[in-house]
């Protein structure tokens, strides 16, 4: 359930992009009331603009719902909201999808930078802070895991740019949801297999 909630803006972005050409013209015309959103009914190049506007609204809703339920903000949601508002807003203002295409890369690289900073400047790397209640590992292994996450975020950001510039917009939209999710799941599963060797029998 939490995974779905975290992916909520991305899922709506994908759905809005795919369904844009099926929207009735009068609904598309009515969307012009949204600031910087000027759409032409049936124009395929406008699908990314519509999807970007939906993603901005979904991110605002995500942060609001999380705060309403937990009475606090989650850092990942705030970072995503800030970037989608800035880069998504630039996409709508300049009618240029380049800005929103950079968002996944910037998000990944910011997280990678945070993991790197935690390893260089704090006593415990971020991955240890997040997982130490579930498993006990030597410091060297925590550092190795943290380094693996840094590499993962770097590679994910580069992969997003490669798909964004080497393939069509439609391919990138699919990759943004399914490709990035697939990469993350593969990495997490690989990490789980790696960690099994450090589990004590009592922890199984």
Swiss-Prot record:
It holds the Pfam family IspA. Its main location: membrane. It is found in: Cell inner membrane. One of its GO terms (cellular component) is plasma membrane. The chain crosses the membrane at residues 48-68, 73-93, 102-122, 147-167, 170-190. The keyword Membrane applies. InterPro entries: YciB. Keywords: Cell inner membrane, Cell membrane, Membrane, Transmembrane, Transmembrane helix. Belongs to the YciB family. Plays a role in cell envelope biogenesis, maintenance of cell envelope integrity and membrane homeostasis. This is Inner membrane-spanning protein YciB. The lineage of its organism: Bacteria, Pseudomonadati, Pseudomonadota, Gammaproteobacteria, Chromatiales. The gene is yciB.
